[in-house]
Amino acid sequence: MNEYNVGDLISDFLFENDLKTVFGVVSVHNIPILDAIAKRNLIKFVPARGEMGAGHMADGFARSSDKVGVVITSTGPGAANVVGSLVEARFAGTPLLPVSYTHLTLPTNLSV
């Protein structure tokens, strides 16, 4: 049986909205999204060394292509590191979509 997870949903959303180039940083937290993108081979992922750089790359792409720039980040500090480029894009009027992902975890003292 094939699983359809949040990464698949995000990948499908990006493709269906003609967002076929995305920028980001590979991390353990966003692997489900990147796996789904790679599995379909319909969206180009452009890796960056840091989230801020990825955000600026997505901003530049959006400005030069008249498309929405997409940046995929890690969680926590990784997501925070993209904020500077989001602010720049906001004040420039550039459409930029930040995407971050984490797994749902339950506290260890809960029984389900």
Predicted features by range, described:
Residues 58, 85, 102:
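Aromatic/hydrophobic pocket-lining residues that form π-stacking "cages" and hydrophobic walls in ligand
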Residues 102-108:
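Conserved small/polar residues in nucleotide/adenosyl-binding loops
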Residues 1-74, 78:
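Thiamine diphosphate
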Residues 74, 83-87:
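Active-site-proximal alpha-helical scaffold in enzymes
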Residues 89-100:
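Hydrophobic or amphipathic alpha-helical targeting/insertion segments
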